[in-house]
């Protein structure tokens, strides 16, 4: 599923942590990621609040932040993955198995569109999740690489009024891409007191137009 996994990671962190807790980034957190994968430029030894880590996770899709948050909550990524699977089962997911907090390629890390919709539905009921996920850009606290505090920007184009694919009513969601998963996209939109969740998996550059088509159909035909 790639980085849409991070919706579940964020939900668990929000349920387990205070936003002001401090997270220390280990060598493993920072460097145990695929080369060239999404990052917020956080380095070994940096210390950030859970809040800043969540903004890095959900806006910049930072894999080092996913690792650090998982270890902060559970002591290891493996233990955190157990929490992820337990939470998914509790939400009614039946076709998923999560093996890491970031969504990077792993043959034992998989989900379904329906399961991701269930996870997203739970996440958008959390006010802090909505605040973080709906933010356009955010300035992180100072780190080694960015002593003035770096900025992270939301990758989800349907939430950005300046993008051609902006969708009126869209208020939350997450992008994802890996070579194995293709383009993945979770989007939540609200219109006339109805909220719809669209999930596109293994997209091939049409994930935004596919999501628009799903929303247009849903809002036209359901009430």
Where are these regions (language model features)?
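Active-site-adjacent loops and short helices of periplasmic peptidoglycan-processing enzymes
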Residues: 1-114, 121-127
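Domain-terminus/edge residues, biased toward the C-terminal soluble/receptor-binding domains
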Residues: 93-94, 105-223
């Amino acid at each position: 599923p790639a980085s849409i996994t991070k919706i579940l990671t964020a939900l668990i962190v929000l349920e387990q942590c205070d936003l002001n807790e401090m997270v220390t980034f280990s060598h493993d957190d920072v460097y145990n990621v695929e080369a060239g994968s999404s990052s917020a430029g956080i380095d070994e030894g940096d210390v950030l609040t859970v809040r800043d880590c969540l903004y890095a996770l959900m806006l910049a899709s930072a894999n080092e932040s996913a690792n650090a948050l998982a270890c902060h909550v559970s002591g290891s990524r493996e233990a955190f993955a157990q929490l992820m699977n337990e939470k998914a089962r509790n939400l009614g997911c039946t076709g998923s198995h999560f093996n890491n907090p970031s969504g990077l390629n792993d043959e034992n890390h998989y989900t379904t569109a329906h399961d991701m919709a269930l996870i997203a539905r739970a996440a958008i009921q959390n006010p802090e999740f909505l605040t973080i996920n709906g933010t356009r850009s955010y300035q992180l606290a100072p780190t080694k690489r960015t002593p003035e505090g770096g900025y992270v920007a939301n990758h989800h184009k349907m939430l950005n009024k300046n993008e051609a694919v902006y969708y009126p009513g869209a208020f939350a969601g997450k992008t994802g891409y890996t070579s194995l998963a293709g383009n993945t996209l979770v989007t939540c939109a609200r219109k006339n007191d109805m909220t719809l969740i669209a999930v596109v998996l293994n997209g091939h550059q049409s994930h935004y137009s596919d999501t628009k088509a799903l929303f247009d159909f849903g809002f036209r035909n359901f009430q």
